Amino acid sequence: MKNYARISCTSRYVPENCVTNHQLSEMMDTSDEWIHSRTGISERRIVTQENTSDLCHQVAKQLLEKSGKQASEIDFILVATVTPDFNMPSVACQVQGAIGATEAFAFDISAACSGFVYALSMAEKLVLSGRYQTGLVIGGETFSKMLDWTDRSTAVLFGDGAAGVLIEAAETPHFLNEKLQADGQRWAALTSGYTINESPFYQGHKQASKTLQMEGRSIFDFAIKDVSQNILSLVTDETVDYLLLHQANVRIIDKIARKTKISREKFLTNMDKYGNTSAASIPILLDEAVENGTLILGSQQRVVLTGFGGGLTWGSLLLTL
């Protein structure tokens, strides 16, 4: 009986509009050298007309086309995002309607840059239950609508995009281990999208920023210490082939590699082309690695997927492909 789960297909979709560091230097007090030397980012994709659901719809459509699955075969759709089109309906429900997956239930997961890892973990448990065979897990963001485009400390970091996987029942284990974590006591280190209560009865605080606010140093230190410990709880240099970390900053990845004593060559990166796409960053990286042959589905390569971000949330999955 097929009671395990595996990733059987990957796909990504990013907006056509490419914004370079040089373009940003014309909008704010920054430069290509300043941005690239501190982050590893050279350019990012920014939407001009699309919203998060549009990006995720394209990913879902591509996953069906590439896998040969019919929409009616999809049992569930999970979308990881903190930049939905609306508070309701969920992006996942919009995607379900757009592709005609009438048999699927659908909901969003809000775990910031850890969202895809959280969602993929939940999807595996759904398949393990034996009740569901096939699902779509997508990470999608349009962070450009949450940024203060005059603040060089945050505006230069983020990009828009979406990517995801088809997860199916399997006869052998592919999800080998995991560790998901959170620390709500540090919630204020990274916030965005504060919703102001406009009720005439509400007497509480109404002055807060809707744009992204980040305690950069705190987040950097959190990633180096806590995320490194999380990874080491699952693997060592000898027991992993590749690591796909959330693409926040190349300096973070460099330091995590040193902290964990895992070969830097095993850490895949692509933030130079996309910037920080939050919940989309890991599946975008995964799909690119499959496309260029670095990762091969069905190869039994041992891979770690690690997310970390607002909440604070962080977590890793150890998989065989």
Swiss-Prot record:
ACP-binding: annotated span: 247-251
Residues forming the catalytic site: 113, 246, 276
EC top class named in words: transferase
Main location: cytoplasm
Keywords: Acyltransferase, Cytoplasm, Fatty acid biosynthesis, Fatty acid metabolism, Lipid biosynthesis, Lipid metabolism, Multifunctional enzyme, Transferase
UniProt GO BP: fatty acid biosynthetic process
Pathway(s) served: Lipid metabolism; fatty acid biosynthesis
Subcellular compartments: Cytoplasm
Example of a GO MF term: beta-ketoacyl-acyl-carrier-protein synthase III activity
Domain of life: Bacteria
Function recorded in the entry: Catalyzes the condensation reaction of fatty acid synthesis by the addition to an acyl acceptor of two carbons from malonyl-ACP. Catalyzes the first condensation reaction which initiates fatty acid synthesis and may therefore play a role in governing the total rate of fatty acid production. Possesses both acetoacetyl-ACP synthase and acetyl transacylase activities. Its substrate specificity determines the biosynthesis of branched-chain and/or straight-chain of fatty acids.
Family the UniProt entry places it in: Belongs to the thiolase-like superfamily. FabH family.
Summary of subunit composition and partner proteins: Homodimer.
UniProt name for this protein: Beta-ketoacyl-[acyl-carrier-protein] synthase III
Species assigned in the record: Enterococcus faecalis (strain ATCC 700802 / V583)
